[in-house]
Structures are given as structure tokens and as C-alpha cells.
Amino acid sequence: VDYTLAPDASIPEIVDECRRAVGWLHHQADELGIDPRRIVVSGSSAGAHLAAMVALPGWQQAAGLPADLVRAAVLVSGIYDLAPLVGTSIDIPLNLADSEVESMSPARATLDGFPRSLVCWGEVETTEFKAQSREFANGLTQAGTTCTVLEVPARNHFDVVLDLADPTTDITRRVLSVL
């Protein structure tokens, strides 16, 4: 999804854009030749955060969409709790309010009904990215979601997605198993 970037849009506006994009896919499924019951969201880094926000249950009904809109989520090297960003240079364009940290952090949300997921990260990620990924995956499992975790050996935050171009890698096989 080609969403508006901060500071031109707030995190809630960006999340709304992504949710509307997936809603559009659902509504246009026949025209696009896709099965609206097989929508999978995926993202890396900030994209994983946005994919998790789209996969969160609870917003779909108000948008006139089925509760099970998203069949699965593939989340790579994401940030799921925005609190550590507050006061950092990353927060300058985001300008996160406390209420946004709470409402826009998937790790702080009720995860009951979250679709099956693959949560992965690179072995050479920062401690914070690894911790957030592990904690979010644990939260999903505790909520009853089928969640597969994968630490990709010898990969960092920026090159972990490169393995997705190779059909023989573990991450690609795991992604395909979620589909």
C-alpha cells in the first residue's frame, strides 16, 4: 500500500489508509479476480506494524467488512509497541500523543480473534526489535492465535526480507505455509 508518510499524515491516518486499502480489495475482489476470504497482510519494519494494525479485530464491522477480513498476517521485524519511540528522533515526524501510543500499538490491543500469523525477525536485529517480536508473538499465542515464530539466521533488520526472494529459504517456506 502506498500510504502517506509522516509528518504529512499521523499514525492513525496512516493506519486508516491501510485499513481502507484492504477494505477496497475486499469490495473489488470479483473485479480483481481474487478470493476475498484469502486476504493476507504482510509488512516489514513499519509495514509490519501497519499490517498488524490492519489484522487487529474490532474495526471491520464499523467499516462494513467481515470480522474475518484478514485470513493471515506475515509480520517481519516489526514494532508493535510505539512507546519506545516517544522522545526519540523517530518521533519528530510522528509526534506521537500518549493516546496514539495506546491506540496504535498492536501489542497493547486485545488480540482475541487475531488471524493466524508468522512473526519473524533477523538474528542480527537490535535487542528491541527482537524483544518486541517475541513479546507480540507470545501475546498472540496467549490470545489463542496460531502463531509461528522464526528468527532468520545471519540476517539483520534490512536484509531479512531478501530471503523472501529465494523459494528455498526457511522464511519463504513458512510464509507459504501461512497462505
Question: Where are the language model's segments positioned?
Answer:
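Alpha/beta-hydrolase superfamily serine-hydrolase fold, recognizing
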Residues: 1-179
